[in-house]
């Protein structure tokens, strides 16, 4: 299945948008470079309960937010700055079935007497376009040890069936630290797991349609996998783990592809190409050299259950591909679209049920391309918001 795309760009003419120069000034560096010191944020384009899309871009000391004016677009508001002093330009983003959006990040505040004070922070948006609840500190798994606290990884957050947040982060000792909410919303003390292997990469959590939390973390010469079968259960080491070899840092993503099943995707550190894996199968190569993580979306295309992928290609442009879900042997074709971008592209369905591919341009501005009203996965011209 070969998606088609138009590479031209149109500018949104929505009233109330910031002037071009102001927009660029506010949105500059909206996403970290794919080869920057932090992994690229994924899953940053979400559809709310009212059908409107929202895009989130972590920047130093805050988050930029764009919101559709009406379901299906094409006009947007933003970028609006959601201040968070000390926040690093990385987020883990999770959405509940009710449309609540949870943002989790790392905050660093310089101290004159030694290492910076580092903590994880959490905020919630309950309705599309509405203000965030205040950022709440979740502390640090190393407590008051600021030297170790500075060396934690980036967080990965998911929601269980009750809507409670489960947070995972690699700690400074090479183990896993974990924190979760109870069903009442109260945060529990830090816990985690200490494998025989030394964890070296970022935690990547996902949940099955049955609510099982499934966690992968790269380690020295291995990939470690844990499962949490129930919201209040302990993390248990999984029986099956991918023989992945070298995973490029910050590239693990996942999509629900069947009852109780997740398909994991990552980029190989050896050749930069995409791999897919499910328990019971070896990793499968999907081609697509490039950088950063792969955006994922499972949706019907012409009546066929398909998994759509998008990533930043070797020339810096967004690339899109699709194949029948869980049929990696069918192959896929990567199609470039638009102009060079920064960070990782994102995929979502809009209020009209169309596939939307979004990316940040090299000035940090938001660009979107929507599926055409015709058979297949052809995209209309890009629009700069």
At which residue positions do the language-model features occur?
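A structural motif
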Residues: 2-385
């Amino acid at each position: 299945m070969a998606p088609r795309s138009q590479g031209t760009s149109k500018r949104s003419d929505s009233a109330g948008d910031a002037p071009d120069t102001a927009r660029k000034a506010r949105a500059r560096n909206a996403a970290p470079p794919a080869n920057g010191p932090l992994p690229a944020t994924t899953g940053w384009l979400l559809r709310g309960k009212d059908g409107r899309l929202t895009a989130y871009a972590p920047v130093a000391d805050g988050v930029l937010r764009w919101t559709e004016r009406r379901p299906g677009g094409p006009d947007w508001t933003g970028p609006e700055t959601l201040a968070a002093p000390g926040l690093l330009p990385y987020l883990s983003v999770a959405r509940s079935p009710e449309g609540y959006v949870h943002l989790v990040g790392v905050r660093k505040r310089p101290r004159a007497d030694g290492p910076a004070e580092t903590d994880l922070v959490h905020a919630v948006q309950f309705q599309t376009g509405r203000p965030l609840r205040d950022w709440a500190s979740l502390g640090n798994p190393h407590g008051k040890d600021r030297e170790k606290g500075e060396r934690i990884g980036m967080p990965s957050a998911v929601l269980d069936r009750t809507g409670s947040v489960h947070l995972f982060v690699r700690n400074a000792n090479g183990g896993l630290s974990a924190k979760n909410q109870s069903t009442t919303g109260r945060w529990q003390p830090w816990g985690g797991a200490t494998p025989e292997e030394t964890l070296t990469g970022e935690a990547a959590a996902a949940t099955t349609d049955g609510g099982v939390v499934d966690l992968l973390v790269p380690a020295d010469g291995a990939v470690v996998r844990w499962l949490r079968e129930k919201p209040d259960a302990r993390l248990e080491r999984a029986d099956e783990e991918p023989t992945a070899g070298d995973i490029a840092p910050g590239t693990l993503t996942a999509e629900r592809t069947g009852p109780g099943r997740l398909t994991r995707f990552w980029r190989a550190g050896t050749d930069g190409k995409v791999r897919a894996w499910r328990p019971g199968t070896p990793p499968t190569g999907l081609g697509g050299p490039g950088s950063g993580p792969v955006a994922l979306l499972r949706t019907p295309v012409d009546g066929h259950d398909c998994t759509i992928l998008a990533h930043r290609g070797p020339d810096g442009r967004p690339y899109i591909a699709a194949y029948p879900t869980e049929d990696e042997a069918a192959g896929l074709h990567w199609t470039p679209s638009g102009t060079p971008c920064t960070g990782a592209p994102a995929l979502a369905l809009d209020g009209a049920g169309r596939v939307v591919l979004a990316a940040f341009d090299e000035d940090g501005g938001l660009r979107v391309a929507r599926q055409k009203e015709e058979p297949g996965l052809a995209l209309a011209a890009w629009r700069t918001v």
